[in-house]
């Protein structure tokens, strides 16, 4: 099965991608992993990407799409894959459709993790990161025994800039502007399935797998 996973920041995409890919026995492919692999191996595409990254610029779609093409052409993706973090825009989605046609295949399904903005802000703004060991706690869902201190190493906890409510709100606006139109794009193709991403991680995984069973069964 060939899948794309979409959803706003804080929806739990990374976690669900791992579980769903393992359930389907297909590789989880993220653009972050692809970038790191190409850059560390010094591939021609990696060299191009690093040039932009070092300059603090966005890597052009052409470079990203060619990296994705190379990854999807590898043998382990021949029977299926789960894409996490790509596509992010409708032009990227159209390019993905084209490259899959070139590879003689097509997407089967797009899973959308659905969670409202207030819940995303609650999830992300409650995170606290340990200055010592890097462990991430949560003031509501996974609080340390002593407020502001890490149970693991005793170091101070802090709120990353990315987790501050105003930053989260900005990220949500960016998602709505750029990535949310993917929902319409894939909905028009009849490939979109919405998954309620509220509640415990395990419950969300069950909903996602049930949706896949309904599709394939």
Swiss-Prot record:
Localization per Swiss-Prot or TrEMBL: Cytoplasm
Residue segments, region LID: 126-163
Annotated keywords: ATP-binding, Cytoplasm, Kinase, Metal-binding, Nucleotide biosynthesis, Nucleotide-binding, Transferase, Zinc
Example GO BP: AMP salvage
Keyword Nuclease found: no
Residues binding ATP, per UniProt: 10-15, 127, 199
Written domain comment of the UniProt record: Consists of three domains, a large central CORE domain and two small peripheral domains, NMPbind and LID, which undergo movements during catalysis. The LID domain closes over the site of phosphoryl transfer upon ATP binding. Assembling and dissambling the active center during each catalytic cycle provides an effective means to prevent ATP hydrolysis. Some bacteria have evolved a zinc-coordinating structure that stabilizes the LID domain.
Family per similarity comment: Belongs to the adenylate kinase family.
Purpose: Catalyzes the reversible transfer of the terminal phosphate group between ATP and AMP. Plays an important role in cellular energy homeostasis and in adenine nucleotide metabolism.
Protein name: Adenylate kinase
Organism listed in the record: Salinispora arenicola (strain CNS-205)
């Amino acid at each position: 099965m060939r899948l794309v996973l979409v959803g706003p920041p804080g929806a739990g995409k990374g976690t669900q991608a791992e579980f769903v890919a393992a359930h389907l026995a297909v590789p989880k492919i993220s653009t972050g992993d692809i970038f790191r692999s190409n850059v560390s191996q010094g591939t021609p595409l990696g060299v191009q990407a690093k040039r932009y990254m070092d300059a603090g610029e966005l890597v052009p779609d052409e470079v990203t799409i060619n990296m994705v093409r190379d990854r999807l052409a590898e043998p382990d993706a021949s029977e299926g894959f789960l894409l996490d973090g790509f596509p992010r825009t409708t032009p990227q989605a159209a390019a993905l459709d084209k490259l899959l046609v070139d590879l003689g295949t097509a997407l089967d399904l797009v899973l959308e993790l659905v969670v409202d903005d207030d819940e995303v802000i609650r999830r992300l703004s409650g995170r606290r990161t340990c200055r010592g060991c890097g462990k991430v706690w949560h003031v509501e869902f996974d609080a340390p025994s002593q407020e502001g201190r890490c149970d693991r190493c005793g170091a101070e906890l802090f709120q990353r800039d990315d987790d501050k409510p105003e930053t989260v709100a900005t990220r949500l606006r960016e998602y709505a502007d750029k990535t949310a139109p993917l929902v319409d794009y894939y909905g028009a193709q009849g490939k979109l399935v919405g998954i309620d991403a509220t509640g415990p991680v395990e419950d969300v995984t069950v909903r996602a797998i049930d949706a896949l069973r309904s599709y394939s069964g």
